[in-house]
């Protein structure tokens, strides 16, 4: 890992009016996307890796020895998309093959932080599920957490704190070791390391877990849960429960808010931010196309949204690909992107002193 990098010349607001994206090539635009001081709130650390890193893990542990590198990527990942969130979850469970020991988990955390830094992210909230990382090889969640915290801390310090990183804990559904209550207890035990609590995996109505989420929130840990992502669900109950029962401050994805004026009004009134993951939504068939992605409607309606990469390892993308897609297909401007990042900063669960520092530096 080559830490020595040219510092990024981040964009200032006063520069934006002098930049004409329409006259630029795609390569030139990517240089601009990198210079946006990005605040990313929704990225699964356990699914954040490069193709090279993933293949090296598969080879290291002699998994799938009869498959070529390209076949390995096709077998495990979701870069070509699929039929649904359910199909994605099944593939993600396969990816847990690489969580063989604590060394690879620490390495994954290091690479994830460094890659986000190279992409121009200045505030990064990673989230991970202790039970998901642990279940395949029956690892100890305490040692998993130690490895992740150690890996993050080491790279953040090597980068002289030019990227600020925090963790959210996920209690999930969809794999054999999933246990929301155990994950909530783990989150509160390590409250010094976790800035928020989430639910991920299969999208379910969480009202039956109200007691657990109340317990976490009342202990001082804010909530953001996955809801309003899965278009195969017959109604919008997951969103209503997240907002009215769980009292979340943010929603992971939330794009189905666009289907209801009542929900649009509700998230605006309660100042709830939607952590939108554009490429993820298209690849999982939760948005029919980028041209018709609901983020445009939501943004125009005054809903606070932010741009996120979700599971970049599964998609073989990075956060700047999401910016390129939103510009190319939905005509979002640099001013729009700066505003979204200001919203993300405002709604981040990180310490207010760090947020103030980032605001003064970049916004």
Curated annotation (Swiss-Prot):
Zn(2+) binds at residues 42, 44, 226, 310. Inhibited by coformycin and methylthiocoformycin (MT-coformycin). A purine D-ribonucleoside binds at residues 44-46, 172, 201, 229, 253, 310. Its EC number is 3.5.4.4, 3.5.4.31. Residues 170-184 are annotated as: Gating helix loop. It comes from the Eukaryota. Binds 1 zinc ion per subunit. Pathway: Purine metabolism; purine nucleoside salvage. PROSITE patterns: A_DEAMINASE. The record marks 172 as: Important for substrate specificity for S-methyl-5'-thioadenosine. Catalyzes the hydrolytic deamination of adenosine to produce inosine. Unlike mammalian adenosine deaminases, also catalyzes the deamination of 5'-methylthioadenosine (MTA), a by-product of polyamine biosynthesis, to produce 5'-methylthioinosine (MTI). Plays an essential role in the purine salvage pathway which allows the parasite to use host cell purines for the synthesis of nucleic acids. This is Adenosine deaminase. It comes from Plasmodium vivax (strain Salvador I).
